Every structure is written in C-alpha cells, then in structure tokens.
C-alpha cells in the first residue's frame, strides 16, 4: 500500500526496522509479521504476533522499509486506528499494539477488552 493513503493501522518505523532485521536472520525474504487477536487473557482478548510467509484472501498487508505487516479482517476490526510498534526497555524488548479501541487493558498490556 502507498504511504500517502490513510491506513487503518500504523506500522511504525521501529517495528518495521526490527522485522527487517529478524527476517534477515531467518534468510527468508517472504516472511511478514502477522498481528492477530484471539480470545483469552485476563481482559477478554489478547494480541498475538507470528512470522508468516502466507497472505490469505482478505488479509491486509502494510508495507514499510520493504517488509510487510499482515492482519486478517477479523483482527483488523479491533485494531483500526491503532499502531504496531517495537519497544526496548527494562522489561525487555517486544512488539506492542497501541489500541484506541481498547476500553481496558491488563497490567502487562497483552490483553484488552472492547
């Protein structure tokens, strides 16, 4: 997708940069970071991340720095207006989701309710 089109989900430079490095380590340029939502966690829904070399029908792919972020349509409805980022800090390094649709989140930030 073009950078000048309003996207429903932001893929930050930090996240794209980390994905680029991780894909280079795997030596598979077809890999993309997939973000998804599943039921569970202490708040009802939880975020998941995996590397995937398949893009399914209906998936949205957001390209940045030559790498892709893939989201299935069911998960995207909960993520509209949000951002996938990468952070490094005292608690470790990880991909995170900033989600304006979440009414509450758990302390670790990996689960939420709407």
Curated annotation (Swiss-Prot):
Protein name: Iron-sulfur cluster insertion protein ErpA
Purpose of the protein: Required for insertion of 4Fe-4S clusters for at least IspG.
Keywords from the UniProt entry: Iron, Iron-sulfur, Metal-binding
Domain of life: Bacteria
Gene Ontology CC terms, in alphabetical order: cytosol
PROSITE patterns the UniProt entry points to: HESB
InterPro entries referenced in this protein's UniProt entry, alphabetically: FeS_biogenesis, FeS_cluster_insertion, FeS_cluster_insertion_CS, FeS_cluster_insertion_RrpA, HesB-like_dom_sf
Residues that bind iron-sulfur cluster: 42, 106, 108
GO molecular function: 2 iron, 2 sulfur cluster binding; 4 iron, 4 sulfur cluster binding; iron ion binding
The UniProt record lists the keyword Nucleus: no
Record-linked PANTHER family: IRON-SULFUR CLUSTER ASSEMBLY 2 HOMOLOG, MITOCHONDRIAL
GO biological processes: iron-sulfur cluster assembly
Pfam families assigned to the protein according to its UniProt record, in alphabetical order: Fe-S_biosyn
Entry cofactors: iron-sulfur cluster
Organism: Klebsiella pneumoniae (strain 342)
């Amino acid at each position: 997708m073009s950078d000048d089109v309003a996207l429903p989900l932001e893929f930050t430079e930090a996240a794209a940069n980390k994905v680029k490095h991780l894909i280079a380590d795997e030596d598979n340029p077809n890999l993309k970071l997939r973000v998804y939502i599943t039921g569970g966690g202490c708040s009802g829904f939880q975020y998941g991340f995996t590397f995937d070399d398949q893009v399914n029908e209906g998936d949205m792919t957001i390209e940045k720095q030559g790498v892709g972020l893939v989201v299935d349509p069911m998960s995207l409805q909960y993520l509209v207006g949000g951002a996938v980022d990468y952070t490094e800090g005292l608690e470790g390094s990880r991909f995170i989701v900033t989600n304006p649709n979440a009414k509450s989140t758990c302390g670790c930030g990996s689960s939420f309710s709407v």
